[in-house]
């Protein structure tokens, strides 16, 4: 793929992330207007950088032909909530929506990863309308509490620093922190 082809390929994903951020923030706004506790604290989103996509394709043996189906997190959104109960609340709100279809759910809160990582992941099908017609893409929505996010961020940084080979003491501390 040339850079211009990549840009063209990523356009619908960029559009989807923009639209989904507005829609998810809209949910928060509606709760606040009614003076109710919003399960959504804040929303971030990104499109995976081209280099990261290429790297993951090599690591997983994914071809360009199957890229759209096999790489489910090219478009990624993160929904932060205050409390663990809010996670399920957000999941049920998203299940009721007509403008997206949840095709996969991974509950790393109930079933935390060995590392202690906790988060709720949804893979959705989402359709964007472009001047060339409509295009359905896959996007990943991660829902987690602020504490889980803080933990995941630290774990990610440590992984980077120690190349995944943590000193035992840090590993123990991380596991204790993950339980909070």
Where are these regions (language model features)?
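Charge-rich, low-complexity segments
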Residues: 1-72
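Long beta-strand-rich cores associated with HINT superfamily self-processing modules
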Residues: 68, 81-180
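Short amphipathic alpha-helical segments
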Residues: 73-77
């Amino acid at each position: 793929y040339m850079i211009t082809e990549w840009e063209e390929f990523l356009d619908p994903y960029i559009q989807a992330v923009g639209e989904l951020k507005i829609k998810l923030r809209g949910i928060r706004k509606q709760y606040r207007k009614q003076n109710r506790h919003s399960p959504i604290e804040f929303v971030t989103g990104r499109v995976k950088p081209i280099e990261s996509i290429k790297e993951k394709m090599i690591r997983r043996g994914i071809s360009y032909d199957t890229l759209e189906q096999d790489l489910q997190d090219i478009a990624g959104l993160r929904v932060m909530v205050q409390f663990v109960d809010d996670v399920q609340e957000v999941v049920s709100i998203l299940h009721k929506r007509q403008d997206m279809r949840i095709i996969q759910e991974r509950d790393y809160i109930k079933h935390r990863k060995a590392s202690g990582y906790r988060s709720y992941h949804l893979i959705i099908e989402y359709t964007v309308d472009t001047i060339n017609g409509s295009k359905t893409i896959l996007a990943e929505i991660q829902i987690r509490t602020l504490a889980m996010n803080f933990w995941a961020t630290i774990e990610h940084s440590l992984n980077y620093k120690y190349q995944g080979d943590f000193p035992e003491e840090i590993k123990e501390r991380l596991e204790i922190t993950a339980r909070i």
